[in-house]
Amino acid sequence: MEQNESVGSLSWRLSSHPITLLCFLGFRISSLLVYLFGMLFIKNFVMIFIITILLLAADFYYLKNIAGRRLVGLRWWNEVDPASGDSHWVFESSDPNTKIINPTDSRFFWLALYSQPLLWVGLAFVAIFRFEFIWLTLIVIALSLTVTNTLAFSRCDKFGQASNLAGSAMYSSGIAGNIASATIGRFFSR
């Protein structure tokens, strides 16, 4: 049976990085599945809590440091100024002229990134309606990790688009373009 899969469709076979994509989706789905099946069948809170936290931590790390960079060309981190103790987020995006983002990878990435916090919110309502408030502690931790990555990658994408737009607009004006590209590039890539 032959299927015509268009560019950008949700098929992992069209991915530029299928192993990265499958690991990314595996981490995203595994914490939800362990929580769901643990809550419904096992009922051992401590075991499910520990396994889910470990999977959420692995998902957070893999998404932040590997999947974001390879699938959509985005990366973020938090820096602390040693002199003042101030903390700020640093965003990095790949150069669109050197790295072409696969539409399939991008669709999988953004869909999984935005849907997981919504699923955890839904599970919070389930825990509330079932009067299992102890499970809310795990959901709050899951939401804090997934929402942090979601907000950071959303900001990173906006800053990356803004820097690319500013760099290309100023690029046509010669010296001003070189100055703008160098300044913006240095600001967003540390």
UniProtKB/Swiss-Prot annotation:
Transferase is among the record's keywords: no
Keywords: Golgi apparatus, Membrane, Transmembrane, Transmembrane helix
GO CC term, one of those recorded: Golgi membrane
UniProt topology in membrane: Multi-pass membrane protein
A Gene Ontology biological process term: vesicle-mediated transport
Localization: Golgi apparatus membrane
Keyword Lipid biosynthesis: no
Stored Pfam families: DUF846
Transmembrane segments: 14-34, 36-56, 107-129, 134-153
Major location (coarse): Golgi
Primary role: Golgi membrane protein involved in vesicular trafficking.
Family indicated by similarity: Belongs to the TVP23 family.
PANTHER family: GOLGI APPARATUS MEMBRANE PROTEIN TVP23 (PTHR13019:SF7)
This protein's name: Golgi apparatus membrane protein tvp23
Record organism: Botryotinia fuckeliana (strain B05.10)
